[in-house]
Design a protein with these regions (language model features):
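Acidic, polar-rich low-complexity tracts and alpha-helical solenoid repeat scaffolds
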Residues: 1-253
Length: 253
């Protein structure tokens, strides 16, 4: 801030100070103030071939993104990817993911998919998010087989990913929609077995009970519901399982 007050002393130092103050505001979650400072920096700096200039667009994109102003965020991320000279930069792959995320609420699915694909190409080691999102978008377009193959790719190529439990759940749901109950059950069972602490394991237990019930396997349905009740006492899913359990018993009698 001192450099900003002494602005006439050195214009470029003053402009850089706006960038750094914008950074501070961003880290504190004061996104409107961050936007104001980044924009002041971008409008006034004469040094436009620098890493800092490109990064300001990236940070500005994130500030808008945090405020859910996706169209403004989209424009800034696109400006950043045009300006970034280092094609290996982790922030470049990340920006393509965010571009995909900005296009998704406007239902521009194929464009979003393209950007997720670019992110995977640029940074294969961090491609799990991009592949998950691509699969999710395929599901929204009712391409359930495409979605399953994306989820399978994530599970096999990124076994340590934080998205593996999500991928198994979405895979199971896709098989349900394809009316392939045995493959759906396998996906849900694997999720429950390998990620018992995941909130999705509870949901998978309910799905499993329903699958077995609809598949005329009441004994297996009862076992699935009982497992949810005993493993996750007090949860919302345990309450649902108890209701469903009663319904199965009524049907059996």
């Amino acid at each position: 801030s001192q450099a900003i007050q002494l602005g006439s002393y050195n214009m470029e130092a003053r402009n850089d100070a706006y960038f750094w103050r914008g950074e501070s505001y961003y880290r504190m979650g004061e996104y409107e103030n961050a936007i104001s400072d980044y924009r002041t920096y971008l409008n006034n700096t004469r040094q436009r071939n620098t890493d800092m200039y490109a990064l300001a667009y990236y940070n500005l994109g994130y500030s808008y993104f945090k405020l859910r102003d996706y169209s403004a965020a989209l424009n800034r991320f696109r400006q950043y990817v045009d300006l970034e000279s280092n094609r290996q930069a982790a922030s470049l792959a990340d920006a393509y993911n965010r571009i995909g995320d900005c296009l998704y609420p406007n239902r521009q699915f194929s464009l979003a998919e393209e950007n997720y694909s670019r992110a995977v190409q640029l940074s294969p080691s961090a491609g799990d998010y991009s592949i998950y999102q691509k699969g999710f978008l395929l599901g929204l377009q009712k391409d359930y087989k495409g979605k399953i193959s994306a989820m399978d790719r994530l599970i096999s190529e990124y076994p340590e990913s934080q998205y593996v439990d999500d991928a198994l759940f979405e895979k199971g749901r896709s098989y349900v929609l394809l009316e392939n109950s045995s493959s759906a059950a396998q996906a849900f069972e694997k999720l429950i077995r390998e990620f018992p602490q995941s909130s999705l394991a509870r949901k998978a237990g309910i799905q499993l009970g329903l699958l077995y019930y609809n598949d005329n396997q009441p004994e297996k349905a009862l076992a699935a519901y009982k497992q949810v009740i005993s493993n996750y006492p007090g949860s919302e899913e345990a309450k649902i399982a108890l209701q469903d359990l009663k319904s199965v018993y009524i049907d059996l009698n």
